[in-house]
Every structure is written in C-alpha cells, then in structure tokens.
C-alpha cells in the first residue's frame, strides 16, 4: 500500500500523516499523482512527496544531520557511501553538507528520490546487498560511510561496509533496537518498550565493533523516533587507536563504556517517554 510505503521509506511519520499527504495531492508514484492511500506501491516506480516542506527528501535526513553535528563529522569534499539509501534522506544530507560524491547503496530498486538519482554527484547502486560489498565496487573508494537499514542487524552490515573505506575512515550508523533485540524483547507492533533492552543492544553493538578493529567513540539519541515510535540511536565509529585515529585536537578517541550508554539511554527515555521509569 502507498500509505505503508510512505512510512517505511521515511516520507511520512505515521500512517495518518501518509494518508493526509495522499489526500492533499502531494504524493506521486512513477511521476503520476497517487489517488488512494490504499493503492499498491508498485515495485520499480519511484514514490515521492512534493511540497512537503522537508529540508531533505525524507524525514530520515534529520537523523544523520543530528549525527554530523553531534559528532563533528565534516563531509566536505569527501567520497561517501550510504548503505541502505532507500529514498535518500542520508544521501541528501551528505550532499548538502558538501560531499563530493555519494554511493547510494540499496538492495531495493526504484526507491531513490528522482532529484538525487539525477544528481551527478550520486552513484546509484541498486539491487546491491550490503553483505556483498567489497572495495572493488568503488572507484574512488569512500572514506566516510553512513547506514540506516531495517530488518537486518548491523552485525551483518558493518563488516563489509567498514572494509570498503580507506583514507580518513569514519562511519556513522543508525542503531534500530527493534531490529537488533531478541524477538522476545520486542513488544507488540515491533516496538521496544524497555530501556534495559536498549542498553543491552547498544552494549552488544559497541563490543561487536571492537572485534572488527574499530571502536565506537560517540553515541547520541536520534532526534526523531522510527515510524512506529521506536527510539533509535546514532553511533560514531572510527578505527581503533592502534590505527592512528585522532580527534581534532590530536587526541586518541575514547571508547564508550557502559556508563556512557546508560546516560544516553536515560536521556532518550526522558525525552520520548518522560513519565516512564528507566530501569537500573
């Protein structure tokens, strides 16, 4: 359905908002105006929202924009890879931040917004599974990577994605606990409603990153929730100190510890669920 596809691709924050956009005549499928929210979103046809007054092609752009600001990531002049590009919210942010080129990688087809698809700085890599990424697919190789993926764990995406980077390597990942937690830890509607699960998931991902020869040096809360109201997190990943990683002042980055994770999770719950008691 068109309304569900709008939410899934980050073009609307809820099904109600998606239906309203269709009724207002702002939704286009393959160049033609969508008539009903219940119509099928046919594969291969680009779904777009016009005049929606968003600064990016999808609301997901707000998430990466927050990460670039919070972690002090400079995309100017860099070659980047967006793993799980979908409509292109992250790709759009990178371009607006001055990226020289963005490889937009997605396993799907026809999802990327037409404006980005026709931008000379964007290399569209559709029908490309993140698990199969290798350095040989990129010329030139990217130094900055970002990812926003669904229905797959970062543990499957990060190993190949990190390996394609070269130069001043850095990676920003959106962590979606609903796709990382055990099935029994995810509540009705696919929503994680336990802060302890958030801490557990983030701790596991941070430790996993360490096994890859990288380290998570920054963690922040996504400024907006996922489509079903899930709290999401942003992770700043750099090569380990042994690889010579340094911040702007020449200092080696510090690893995140359990206390850091607990503080960020508590801040997230205070923002999105102020009446809830965070477990300790």
Model-derived segments and their meaning:
Residues 1-45, 80:
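A basic, amphipathic helix-loop patch mediating RNA/tRNA/ribosome contacts
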Residues 177-194:
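Short, glycine-/aromatic-enriched active-site segment of Class I SAM-dependent methyltransferases
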Residues 11, 69-76, 138-139:
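Glycine-rich helix-loop-beta junction characteristic of Rossmann-like nucleotide cofactor-binding loops
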Residues 87-98:
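Conserved SAM-binding loop of SAM-dependent methyltransferases across substrates and taxa
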Residues 231, 236-280:
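Flexible, glycine-/basic-rich loop-and-beta segments that form/coincide
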Residues 76-86:
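Conserved class I S-adenosyl-L-methionine
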Residues 155-172:
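A short glycine-rich, Lys/Arg-flanked "PGG" loop and its adjoining helix->strand segment in the class I
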Residues 103-156:
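S-adenosyl-L-methionine
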